């Protein structure tokens, strides 16, 4: 399975709420590759405008935007948060108070989209405040088959609501925002994609664009599982799973700035009793070079696509993840982490 959020707000309705900005150097690399308007100078002011940062916002900058950015006070961190913090300090990693500041790396608190203890999704931040507008209609339970073209001009979409029949809705503009999985699927069913693959599925080719659905990427994570001593186990519905993280630059395999992150997990899901016996600490590659693809299996929009992640396919990704696991293992041997656990395992192997 490749889990996605099927709701207004998409995957922001089910994700970890973590609100980490992209690294400025990465945006500049996009601009250098030809993505006009995506340099750090272009993008960072937009982050400033959409955020309402409870800790670092100032009038006119990172304050008053539709999406709250909040950090758990350290005195309320979980046991694994505190253990990772203290172990990282003991190992000599620097502290980075504001993870979203453009420069630096190190130990930080995860910023999250939260207000008054409640998740704030893109639906909450953008759509709900506009719900009462006379010129806005919101319709859910919709399945988009394809975009409708007149010649090479977009004029609408073919869509089904609930169990009804497919219908065509026309409009001056179509904004395609179905996520990393279904946006390319809609394009391919619309005839935009690899001509040979589309023809094999009986889809009329509008534009031969082999890159559609290709170059898929995601961040691999490997976790050390912590069997926590009873007094360090997370308890209660409000026990947040993660607050503490550690970013660093591997300087391996051509990786970019701040390409790696180590994340504390106070629990891996609460048990029915409300007490979680296990926590974890994960290391993740945030600048992956491996590429996969999203591929249609049918022209039928009810049929799910195949998602080939190809994680760790690139040798530089394997190099950096091996280094990351070694770093994580060293942190786990330090007393702040070792002292709160009964056992530490990587998969089926003991530390």
Predicted regions and their residues:
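Flavin-binding catalytic cores
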Residues: 204-206, 314-340
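Cytochrome P450 core scaffold surrounding the K-helix E-X-X-R motif
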Residues: 24-31, 149, 292-294, 304-307
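N-terminal glycine-rich phosphate/pyrophosphate-binding loop and immediately adjacent elements
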Residues: 1-48, 204-212, 217-228
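Flavin (FAD/FMN) cofactor-binding core of flavoprotein oxidoreductases
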Residues: 219, 289, 332-351
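FAD cofactor-binding and catalytic pocket of flavoenzymes
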Residues: 221-326
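Conserved redox-cofactor binding core of oxidoreductases
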Residues: 31-154, 160, 223-227, 235-236, ...
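General small-molecule cofactor/ligand-binding pocket signal
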Residues: 96, 137-139, 204-208, 263
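Glycine-rich loop(s) and the adjacent beta-strand/alpha-helix scaffold that form part
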Residues: 46, 147, 156-238, 299
